[in-house]
A protein has these predicted regions:
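Short, glycine-/small- and polar/acidic-enriched structural segments
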Residues: 1-77, 93-104, 111-124
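A bilobed periplasmic-binding-protein/Venus flytrap-type ligand-binding module shared by bacterial periplasmic
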Residues: 13-25, 126-143, 157
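Second-shell loop/turn segments in exported
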Residues: 45-49, 135, 155-159
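Short acidic active-site motifs
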Residues: 83-84, 102
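Hydrophobic residues within well-ordered alpha-helices
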Residues: 87-89
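Short gly/pro-enriched beta-turn/loop segments at secondary-structure junctions
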Residues: 124-125, 166
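Secondary-structure end/capping motifs
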Residues: 140-177
Length: 177
């Protein structure tokens, strides 16, 4: 079993649909439901980063809230996040749920549009956590505590405006985006 001592982030994901669907007039979940009803022979395929992910949960919750059965009305497929935009552009998927930078890439390249933000679907949802196995946490309690403390110190450092330029310089390097 895995245990978590710390939430690392909340919210931060978006549901992106292809610019082609947008050009067809799909601007809302209601529009998407109507498009599905008008084209019963077409499978609308949507990508997510993993079947055991918040992205899957968000997609399913959002679709179901709009009267779309995620198991019957659309096809859900797992795609690694760095491949989302290319698959959207190629027409392999109609949309996806992911975090940045992939959403920004889709929007900035004109390939996709934001249909929904996770903040609007499930406000305050946990996104990333520090997870360790229970066995490890019990075997190394001081190391576990030191890890949590180090992460909290790093958070404080990143949150300090005096360190803003340095932090931005680090996280905006090409290998991280």
């Amino acid at each position: 079993p895995v245990c978590s001592a710390m939430t690392l982030s909340r919210n931060g994901n978006s549901i992106i649909f292809s610019k082609d669907l947008y050009k067809e007039g799909i601007r809302t979940l209601e529009d998407f439901k109507a498009a599905i009803a008008k084209t019963p022979d077409k499978v609308h395929t949507l990508g997510m980063v993993h079947s055991a992910s918040m992205h899957n949960l968000l997609f399913r919750y959002w679709l179901a809230a709009g009267g779309i059965d995620p198991d019957l009305d659309v096809g859900l497929t797992v795609i690694p996040p760095p491949q989302m935009v290319a698959n959207l552009k190629a027409g392999n998927i109609d949309g996806y749920c992911s975090g940045d930078p992939w959403n920004s890439h889709a929007v900035n390249s004109g390939t996709g549009v934001v249909m929904a933000r996770s903040l609007d679907i499930l406000p305050g949802h946990i996104e990333k956590v520090l997870g360790v196995t229970e066995d490890w946490a019990q075997k190394y309690p001081q190391t576990h505590l030191a890890l949590v403390k180090a992460l909290l110190e790093a958070c404080d450092y990143c949150d300090d405006r005096r360190n803003r330029e340095e932090v931005l310089g680090l996280i905006s390097q090409e290998q991280y985006i």
